Amino acid sequence: NTDQSFPGFVGSEMWNPNTELSEDCLYLNVWIPAPKPKNATVMIWIYGGGFQTGTSSLHVYDGKFLSRVERVIVVSMNYRVGALGFLALPGNPEAPGNMGLFDQQLALQWVQKNIAAFGGNPKSVTLFGESAGAVSVSLHL
């Protein structure tokens, strides 16, 4: 289904303490201009939130306008935040730290392997973000 955030979570509900949440968060959103391009530039958005909160499902991060107007493929990702993403307990293999960055790295690898099937060029990828997302971009360089 187009124009639907997976898993149907509209983002703003994350502030409601009664919202049921899950660590199952490794999802990508992909916006493709119509008609499907051939060899399009890819822009990957990483949201901010101080590495503590956030989701790529917020309406403000909807990439369809950018994709349509600029004829680029826009990808956004979710990654683990807070203790699930960044808790580090030295010497404990259960909490090595920076798992949220590894989630991001996994998303970047997926884009490299699969974006051509969406009409994207894996050799023309731009990372961008705000706040912790911008810091993440610098950490992946």
Curated annotation (Swiss-Prot):
Its EC number is 3.1.1.8. Disulfide bonds: none annotated. The active site is at 131 (acyl-ester intermediate). One of its GO terms (molecular function) is acetylcholinesterase activity. It is an enzyme of class 3 (hydrolase). It comes from the Eukaryota. Glycans are attached at residue 39. It catalyses: an acylcholine + H2O = a carboxylate + choline + H(+). Present in most cells except erythrocytes. Keywords: Disulfide bond, Glycoprotein, Hydrolase, Phosphoprotein, Secreted, Serine esterase. It is found in: Secreted. InterPro entries: AB_hydrolase_fold (IPR029058), AChE-related_enzymes (IPR050654), CarbesteraseB (IPR002018), Carboxylesterase_B_AS (IPR019826), Carboxylesterase_B_CS (IPR019819), Cholinesterase (IPR000997). The modification Phosphoserine is found at residue 131. GO terms for cellular component: extracellular region. The keyword Nucleotide-binding does not apply. Substrate binds at residues 49-50. Homotetramer; disulfide-linked. Dimer of dimers. Belongs to the type-B carboxylesterase/lipase family. Esterase with broad substrate specificity. Contributes to the inactivation of the neurotransmitter acetylcholine. Can degrade neurotoxic organophosphate esters. This is Cholinesterase. The gene is BCHE.
